[in-house]
Amino acid sequence: ADDPVYDAEGNKLVNRGKYTIVSFSDGAGIDVVATGNENPEDPLSIVKSTRNIMYATSISSEDKTPPQPRNILENMRLKINFATDPHKGDVWSVVDFQPDGQQLKLAGRYPNQVKGAFTIQKGSNTPRTYKLLFCPVGSPCKNIGISTDPEGKKRLVVSYQSDPLVVKFHRHEPE
C-alpha cells in the first residue's frame, strides 16, 4: 500500500486540506505570474516564488467514488487548486507549448491543456520531503521541476530532464 503524505509538522495530509507548498532547498513558496505573451493583468503561469508569496493550495483526491479517502497517499491521483485570493479556486493544469514543453498554468485558459493528474512521491532521504509529479493520461508520470526563463522567472515545468522540485507541505493557518 502507498504511504500517507505528511506535512512538515508530521501530520498526515488531509484530503481537501489546505497547505502551503514550500521549496525544501530555499523555503520559497509557489506564485502565479505573467510570463511570455500573457496579459500582465491576467497572470497564468505557476512559478517558484521570487518574492515573499505563500499562496495556500487545496489538495484533493481525484477519486470521486464514496467513501472519499480521509488522507492523501503517495501515488494517489490528485487535483491541486489555489485556496487563497487572488487565485482562490484556480486549478493547476499542464499545458503543452512547443518547443518549450509542458508548463504549469491556471486551468481553463488554453486549448492545449494536457489531460492527467498530479501525484506526490517521496522527494529525498530527508523525512517529510516530497516531489510533485504530473501523470498524463496513458503515459508515465514525470517530475515537476524548474525552468528559469529569460526574464528570470522560475517556471514549474513537467520534465524527465530537470531535477524535481523537492517540497514540504505546511498546513495553512488562515490569518
From Swiss-Prot:
PROSITE patterns reported for this sequence: SOYBEAN_KUNITZ
Cross-referenced Gene3D superfamilies: 2.80.10.50
SUPFAM superfamilies per UniProt: STI-like
Disulphides: C135-C141
Molecular function, one GO term: endopeptidase inhibitor activity
Superkingdom of origin: Eukaryota
Keyword field contains Disulfide bond: yes
Annotated InterPro entries: Kunitz_inhibitor_STI-like_sf, Prot_inh_Kunz-lg
Disulfide bond keyword on record: yes
Keywords: Disulfide bond, Seed storage protein, Storage protein
Cited PANTHER family: KUNITZ TRYPSIN INHIBITOR 2, TRYPSIN INHIBITOR A
Family: Belongs to the protease inhibitor I3 (leguminous Kunitz-type inhibitor) family.
Primary role: 2S seed storage protein.
Name listed for the protein in its UniProt record: Albumin-1
Organism whose genome encodes this protein: Psophocarpus tetragonolobus
